[in-house]
Amino acid sequence: LAVTSAGPGEGKTLTAVNLAISLAREVNHTVLLVDLDLRNPSVHECFGFQPERGVADIVLQGVPVSEVLIHPGIDRLVVLPGREPLAHSSEVLSSPVMLALVQALKHRSANRIVLFDLPPLLSADDAVAFAPHVDAALLVVEEGKTTRDELTRAVGYLRNTELLGTVLNKSEESVAGYYY
């Protein structure tokens, strides 16, 4: 499952992290959270660690996956972090080595849920190039920021990927408007 957004700052990474934690706590599967926002890797910051190695080290230098995985202290949750921003991220994300890595991660265990934190769809072509390699996507939109045009364009970029739905983030619904 890919988690992405139309633009930057809409909360896709925090949504991916919270979803990963929730799934690890609620289901009987392990959860692997992979930081593929290689231009701005930040999943590790949500857990308060600075990785020595990241996904790019696996793809570009052949570092074994087991040497990059981080266990953040939550049962059944494992993180494959990014590390430092990567300028040529779209080439890395579409490389044969990356695609083989994704297939290996997806099929490594039948009881594993794999979440990919992808870059925003409208910021670069990274997420658009990678989206066909996931089973489904979740689109995060920020209330009051994401325009209808941006949402339409983002959904269009995901037309060849099953879109499970959208997450309305940073909503400021008033208590007065809420009732049972």
Residue ranges and their predicted role:
Residues 1-180:
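P-loop NTP-binding module
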